[in-house]
């Protein structure tokens, strides 16, 4: 089971198995799972079973990689069951691919939000079309931006992520600037940065082993983060770059805390603040 860090204390219920796309070149998360959507009855049965051992559930996260792909009428039945079984629940969240948002009408999105789904986790990865093609994201930057904008208009809280180092040294600046532009247009409620780490089992790892891909070092990753922060205009977005994969930890609110975070990056780049050793980085 994979979940966002902020769902550490949530009840996790499997709505789908695996990821509906499952072809991103950097990802190993669901490679051993054949994607399928669990029956509505089984999901509701799991909720009822969880009620038996949980005295109070404030948050529920529906796994796996693209639970929002489920048909709207099915999710509405599950949302009604959540309200019946866990009336104390304050937040329901799940991962959402661009496709899973775009195939739904505005009325469907509003109905799903109104029924209780509060937060959608979305992966931008990069705003650079060349990078998105290279990593086989399965969506263009414009499609991802539109999906985020439509989700926001429907009332969802949107938590967006991107990945430092995806473009290598040669494409770093373009990746950073295009990602900053995409974030500025989407204006997510939350935006988090991870740093690329290659694991056996993903195509980018195979490229690395074959000598066709050179991962960026800490200086390039930090410069990339700096360019993003300099170019993002998303007032009020909660920004986090404190994932275990990152070389330094940053957190703040855009645009208010941007100058401070830029200074923290500069301190690390100049050697006045520590940079995480490779041995301590984790996914």
Segments predicted by a language model, with ranges:
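Auxiliary Fe-S-binding modules of radical SAM enzymes
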Residues: 1-7, 181-283
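Aromatic/hydrophobic pocket-lining residues that form the small-molecule binding cavity
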Residues: 43, 75, 105, 144, ...
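Conserved SAM/AdoMet-binding glycine-rich loop
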Residues: 51-153, 233-234
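Conserved, mostly hydrophobic/aromatic
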Residues: 19, 27, 43, 62, ...
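Canonical Radical SAM [4Fe-4S] cluster-binding loop centered on the CxxxCxxC motif
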Residues: 2-42
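Conserved strand-turn element in the central/C-terminal portion of the radical SAM core barrel
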Residues: 99, 127-131, 151-175, 194-200, ...
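Catalytic cores of alpha/beta
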Residues: 107-109, 167-185
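Hydrophobic faces of well-ordered beta-strands that scaffold small-molecule active sites
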Residues: 11-13, 58-60, 90-96, 120-122, ...
